[in-house]
Amino acid sequence: YASRGLGDVYKRQYWNRLHQSGKQDALLKAITETDEKISLIAMLRQGTLVRPVPDTGVQRLSDRKIQAELLYNQIPFSVILYRINLMGGILLLLCQWSKRPLFRFRSFRRITFCLLLTSFLFHTFGMILRTYISGRLPMSNGYETMQFMAWIIMLIALCLQHRFSLMACFGFLLSGFTLLVASIGQMNPQITPLIPVLSSPLLSLHVSLIMMSYALLGFIMLNGIAAIIYFRKNEEEQVERLTLLSRILLYPATLILALGIFIGAVWANISWGRYWAWDPKEVWALITLLIYGIAFHTQSIKVFRKPIFFHIFLIAAFTTVLMTYFGVNYFLGGMHSYANN
């Protein structure tokens, strides 16, 4: 008993010296950390570190959905499509501007239509698979919106290629570049659940309208580049034809963009409690709408009656679309920053 009492005295003296030197807290912290590490090692050895708790709210995926997801993961839809579309667009462009344009032959136009339709159907199949697996429309992040925009581009090209042969070339090129950006960019192709605020049909409608307007504005931009090339080759008839097409496409593109912004404001009021917050994405979308709206004022701004100035203006205006979609997502941030995830 005497030795035990003497030991207690020494312990008290030791702790008093540590307390006076300010090292007691550090020692206690080190002892606590060591104890935690020993406990973690023991739990790892016993297999009791992680004990999953069953979530009654999570439903098991059906066998069909599992098979569909396995199939979707085995087929690199974006990679296949952007390679085929870019190659097809370049070849068709060379055929269009060759000394003997092959688009004059009906058989070549039919082959082009079949290739365009095949690419569109393959893309549609991929989007249907993704929709079936996720249980929602694939328009919730940057990767999915780029996929949807490429699909819209192909649909527009299919509808217009029989009247304007260049639309097939532009459809392949524009959709190919869109899918290329989606594939090599820092976008997340994984199928993930939506956060509650994004689970809204208004959001899907808002995104689909905005992407549709961007697709039309992309066609207008390529029309402008082609018109300048034809102007340098002194082919006035082709310039006038492309100018007419751009003016026709500008009306639905601007109207759809305005509707998309309006529906986005309605959704924002439901989700965030306000229609307009001057978020960077909102500001740049409004700038895009106003700049493209200037091109309608041919009576008050007479310089827009000149085809070449009209096309140059629309080519320059497309930079606002790029800034709205890419610049804001990756550089400015804001409430729409989830779009690049």
Regions found by a protein language model. Give the residues of each.
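Single conserved hydrophobic/aromatic residue that forms the stacking wall/gate
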Residues: 1-13
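Core alpha-helical transmembrane segments of integral membrane proteins
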Residues: 61-176, 185, 189-192
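Hydrophobic cores of alpha-helical transmembrane segments in multi-pass inner/ER membrane proteins
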Residues: 88-92, 147-162, 208-227, 285-299
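Membrane-interface interhelical loops and short amphipathic "cap" helices
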Residues: 51-77, 125-146, 187-211, 264-281, ...
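Juxtamembrane transmembrane-helix termini
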Residues: 98-105, 129-136, 160, 164, ...
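C-terminal structured "cap/appendage" subdomains that terminate the fold
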Residues: 280-326
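Interfacial and helix-entry/exit segments of alpha-helical transmembrane bundles
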Residues: 170-175, 236-259, 308-322
